[in-house]
Amino acid sequence: MSEARQQSSSEGGGDLSDYEEKFEQCCTLLEQRIIQDDQIPRNVRRAAKQAIEALKEEGQSPGVRASTAISTLEEVVNDQNTPEYARTVLLQVIATLEQVKDEV
């Protein structure tokens, strides 16, 4: 039984790569669908850049990184100037980050 506990605790590092994979997916979505789209208002693109920076901040725990990015994106998701298709992408990213935050 103790061997199983040791294995599960040593697999904790594998969980970290799961977080990193989700963070990378979110960063890719934000980069390709928000930041590179000139039709999206500057404040929304700026928030997406800030969220990416928060997700890449390796000095913080995955939960803190996800929470910081979520709060940044939530500031602009309800902005009346945010196009509907951009809002959909932002909500998709927020949902993915909520999973990470809840797992921690």
Curated annotation (Swiss-Prot):
Signal peptide: none
InterPro entries, per database record: Ta0600-like_sf, UPF0147
Pfam family, one: UPF0147
Similarity comment text for this entry: Belongs to the UPF0147 family.
Name the record gives this protein: UPF0147 protein MK1586
Organism, scientific name: Methanopyrus kandleri (strain AV19 / DSM 6324 / JCM 9639 / NBRC 100938)
Taxonomic lineage from the root: Archaea, Methanobacteriati, Methanobacteriota, Methanomada group, Methanopyri
